[in-house]
């Protein structure tokens, strides 16, 4: 398979290097890595519009058969440039990850990892966003093995149409993971707290902090699945239309406004 890999943790991140090495070890894959040249977490689907993108080849830390690039742009820039500027032909898969930290519930709206995978889907390419649900756990091998298992399953039973699968892996050994489950996005709420500081020149600046204040209790949610030791798999789509609201909104009689 021809696979394009990106992330939002940057080209130096352990997760993307582990994933590229695992795919290369299997053999039979043409692997291209295009990642930000620095940390780009929580950049969402931002694109670089007002300055050029620059890329540099990266060899250290990747198997020799993997072509890797560091890009000055966002995660979405990386995938877009990879598809339209660096690859000679469209890949079979776009994979974003392995991210350090979960991308669960409504957090996907901020996620550079999920947005990188979504960019692949917007180009009609099936995509995976893969995250290790811990900011401190450093063993990415189980998550890499989950990716290999998913690709094998999907090669035997291909998707009916391209889609994005958001995959969150609990920070456990492979033998400890209880299985894979389909799960819906949870609704996560935070205490958004900006910590005010003052620089040596007396000018105020702010750091965003916050903690989850309400965890999902729905047993079908991705948050619950990962908490119970399962790999959560959530199909995502770019269409954010709230179709269920159409009926109630039609009662407004919009045509009567004279548009």
Curated annotation (Swiss-Prot):
NCBIfam families: PRK00346.1-4, PRK00346.2-2, surE. Binds 1 divalent metal cation per subunit. GO terms for molecular function: 3'-nucleotidase activity; 5'-nucleotidase activity; exopolyphosphatase activity; metal ion binding; nucleotide binding. Keywords: Cytoplasm, Hydrolase, Metal-binding, Nucleotide-binding. Belongs to the SurE nucleotidase family. The lineage of its organism: Bacteria, Bacillati, Cyanobacteriota, Cyanophyceae, Synechococcales. It comes from the Bacteria. This is 5'-nucleotidase SurE. The gene is surE. Its cofactor is a divalent metal cation. GO terms for cellular component: cytoplasm. It catalyses: a ribonucleoside 5'-phosphate + H2O = a ribonucleoside + phosphate. Nucleotidase that shows phosphatase activity on nucleoside 5'-monophosphates. It holds the Pfam family SurE. SUPFAM superfamilies: SurE-like. It is found in: Cytoplasm. A divalent metal cation binds at residues 8-9, 41, 99. Its main location: cytoplasm. Its EC number is 3.1.3.5.
